[in-house]
Design a protein with these regions (language model features):
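Conserved ABC ATPase "signature" region
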Residues: 108-126
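H-loop/switch region of ABC-family ATPase nucleotide-binding domains
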Residues: 190-191
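Catalytic Walker B motif of ABC-type/P-loop ATPase nucleotide-binding domains
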Residues: 155-158
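Conserved ABC ATPase signature
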Residues: 130-134, 138
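ABC ATPase nucleotide-binding domains
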Residues: 217, 221-295
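H-loop (His-switch) and adjacent beta-strand-loop-beta switch element
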Residues: 203-215
């Protein structure tokens, strides 16, 4: 069952297009990591899924049952959020607002769900504390608990580990993985490629002129996937997109219909990923098929 279907999507602001030609599907229970250079439209894509940003081209379809039951959303952490003057319990319960409808008070089921969410995130002892008094890691746990209360099907996370210390990062990844193992589909924007390939079932790589979608295994079979998997920490901080994507061995892949687990867009014309990978295996090195390469 597809929860999200995206076909040839274009996203833009008044200043111009930030992403184009983006295509992917998210199946129930999947774990999708969205990676890519800064400014490539990753956060904007999440906002479009929940209806906070319009689509400028292509189609973006969210399963009606998911929209009805709610989508959990953990946005990027901002200074305004860190200073929010509310208790942990109040913030977590606010995740139940959509399911509560017009009910003017918290139902017993809402309170129970919020209590369960706080317990599983290890913050039940902080229920009465003010949110702005907590550490960054504790605040992220609160927001993850809130997102969990909003849905049992789909959670969108925008750089949930940004600014966390290594121990807090490990705990956050573990809790997200636990939710996914219980059947909750996860879409996470991250610059931590090493973690993305460790936890995700699928990778969406977004760039100003490039887009890849496929299984983690297919991503790691591409030269660019291998390059980033080797990078310590998987950070994009000093990545040069021209060096990575304009290298002769990357080819120009447009539509991989022969490999259902991978669809890629690189430039205006394309060749099969299977042909590129086959050439790589035969030659024991980088694929040299440059058919369709921009001139």
């Amino acid at each position: 069952m597809s929860l999200i279907t995206c076909e040839n999507l274009t996203l833009a602001y008044d200043t111009g297009v930030v992403a184009s030609g983006v295509s992917f599907t998210l199946e129930a229970g999947s774990y999708l990591c969205i990676v890519g250079e800064n400014g490539s439209g990753k956060s904007t894509l999440l906002k479009s899924v929940i209806g906070l940003h319009p689509v400028d081209g292509g189609t973006l379809t969210v399963d009606p049952s998911v929209r009805k039951s709610g989508i959990g959303y953990l946005p990027q952490h901002t200074p305004a959020q860190r200073d929010f003057p509310a208790s942990v319990r109040e913030i977590v319960r606010s995740g139940c607002l959509k399911r509560s409808g017009l009910c003017p008070f918290w139902r017993a089921s809402d309170k129970k769900l919020a209590d369960e969410a706080m317990a599983r995130m290890g913050i039940d002892h902080l229920a009465g504390r003010c949110y702005r008094e907590l550490s960054g890691g504790q605040q992220q746990r609160v927001l993850l608990a809130r997102a969990y209360c909003a849905t049992g099907k789909l959670i969108l996370l925008d750089e949930p580990i940004a600014g966390l210390d290594p121990m807090a990062m490990t705990e956050m990844y573990r809790m997200i993985a636990d939710l996914n193992r219980e059947g909750v589909a996860v879409v996470m924007v991250s610059h931590d490629v090493s973690a993305a390939v460790q936890y995700a079932t699928h990778i969406l790589h977004m760039g100003k002129t490039t887009s890849f979608f496929g299984t983690t295994e297919a991503y790691l079979a591409t030269p660019v996937g291998q390059q980033f998997a080797r990078r310590e920490g998987g950070s994009y901080g000093d990545w040069n997109p021209k060096t990575a994507w304009d290298a002769p061995d990357i080819g120009r892949i447009l539509d991989v219909r022969a490999a259902p687990d991978a669809r890629s867009v690189l430039g205006a014309r394309g060749v099969s990923l299977n042909r590129n990978l086959t050439a790589t295996r035969r030659r024991g090195g980088a694929a040299s098929n440059r058919e369709g390469e921009d001139t």
